[in-house]
Amino acid sequence: MQATKTHVRKGETVMVIAGKDKNKTGTVMQFLPKKDGIIVEGLNMVKRHVKARGNEPGGIKEKEASIHISNVMPYCAKCAKPVRVRLKVLENGDKQRLCAKCGNSLEK
């Protein structure tokens, strides 16, 4: 199976462009290639009924659910809006990810 190519990376700030958390930003915590999804910190919260285990009490807990990658875009702090990604090849052969509008680097 081929690796999924995506426009967002783990640790990057993204903005949700569709769904119940539209226009909210957060950091990508995990990438799920089989589901083409990501888990964003503090967004798409769902309630789970958890059974007590050992010394951990049971109850209703909130956790992040996955969001499809088509519903998020990288967030540029300089533009203060979601942007498309442009790749620039440097002299040494490395690729740098840039904001397509302002040219600001999207690297961590």
Curated annotation (Swiss-Prot):
NCBIfam families: rplX_bact (TIGR01079). One of its GO terms (molecular function) is rRNA binding. Transmembrane segments: none annotated. Belongs to the universal ribosomal protein uL24 family. SUPFAM superfamilies: Translation proteins SH3-like domain. It comes from the Bacteria. Keywords: Ribonucleoprotein, Ribosomal protein, RNA-binding, rRNA-binding. One of two assembly initiator proteins, it binds directly to the 5'-end of the 23S rRNA, where it nucleates assembly of the 50S subunit. One of the proteins that surrounds the polypeptide exit tunnel on the outside of the subunit. InterPro entries: KOW, Rib_uL2_dom2, Ribosomal_uL24, Ribosomal_uL24_KOW, Translation_prot_SH3-like_sf. Part of the 50S ribosomal subunit. The keyword rRNA processing does not apply. This is Large ribosomal subunit protein uL24. One of its GO terms (biological process) is translation. GO terms for cellular component: ribonucleoprotein complex; ribosome. Signal peptide: none annotated. Pfam families: KOW, ribosomal_L24.
